[in-house]
């Protein structure tokens, strides 16, 4: 599974007030954080690039996870510091 938080790239497609530096957290059904990322190139860059789904901006976040057990999960996107704005969360099931 690849989860992405896209913000800065939205500006190029005309989305106003795009979140300029999103962070991403993935939580399990108990609310426990199972993964987090700020700036996708800081963690798992090689593996994320190999999927062909790397975010278009270095400030965007991505988490590459081993297959998740069936169940409910929550993705939380926040801006760093006091940043606010519009972001998109994308979840990809990889082969």
Regions from the PLM with identified roles:
Residues 93-95:
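Boundary/junction segments of secreted and surface-exposed precursor proteins
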């Amino acid at each position: 599974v690849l989860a992405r938080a896209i913000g800065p790239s939205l500006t190029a497609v005309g989305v106003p007030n795009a979140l300029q530096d999103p962070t991403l957290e993935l939580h399990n059904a108990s609310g426990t954080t199972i993964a987090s990322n700020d700036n996708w190139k800081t963690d798992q860059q090689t593996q994320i690039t190999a999927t062909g789904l790397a975010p278009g901006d270095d400030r965007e976040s991505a988490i590459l996870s081993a297959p998740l057990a069936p169940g409910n999960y929550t993705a939380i996107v926040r801006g760093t510091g006091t940043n606010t704005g519009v972001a998109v969360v994308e979840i990809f099931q990889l082969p």
